[in-house]
Amino acid sequence: MGKGRGRHPSRLKVKPPEPEILAKYLHHWNTKELYHHPDTFLQVSSPSFFQNENPLEIDIGCATGDLVCSLAQKNPQVNFIGVEVSMKPLYRAIKYSVREQIENVRFIKTDFRLLYPLLPDASVQKIFFHFPVPVVRAKDSKYLIFSEDFLSEMHRALQVGGMISVISDSAEYFPIMRELGQNDTRYELISDEAKCMALEPDEKSYYHKYWDAQGREKFRFILVKK
């Protein structure tokens, strides 16, 4: 998710929050340690991150946290975790969380794929995968998240009826993801625009708002765990 796309938020000019604030909101996990020793890290779950049993939703590539912070404000009985590889946008997300006194949101700086071993079975209510880097060429394969492996891991981690929300601005990449989802019979595919909109929140991510301002067409589908 770190590949630049338009006005990438990693170029933001923002100072780090105070250490005690970072300690509360941010888990900055070393990728090598996470890859080799995942058992030494916290489980990515509501009990581990929030010390409660509230439903958990995760935003993959959360950027400045616009989506998860807004959702957390609107849904105080749901926990939210934003995952991002770039630090500066997370600084902005954390500062907003502090200013608005949002207690049910946390952030992880790492590659989401490394979190698979840390996601307990049936522990997640919803996954947001909005505006990923389009992976249509071999040289971009290092950015690939949406795959058969991803769908298997998310199926394990999602509760029955849990959802994966996918939105993309790439007419080339979107059909690739949709075909993968459609071929996985463990999920129900919802691709009708009106039905998707009815299931989606009004809140938008950084990229969603950015591409709206550019007038760019967007494509979406939802996968529901059977």
From Swiss-Prot:
What start and end residues bound the annotated signal peptide?
A: none
What gene name is listed for this protein? trmB
Full protein name: tRNA (guanine-N(7)-)-methyltransferase
GO molecular function term, any single one? tRNA (guanine(46)-N7)-methyltransferase activity
What reaction gets catalysed by this protein? Answer: guanosine(46) in tRNA + S-adenosyl-L-methionine = N(7)-methylguanosine(46) in tRNA + S-adenosyl-L-homocysteine
- Family statement: Belongs to the class I-like SAM-binding methyltransferase superfamily. TrmB family.
Q: What is its EC number?
A: 2.1.1.33
A Pfam family that the UniProt record links to this protein: Methyltransf_4
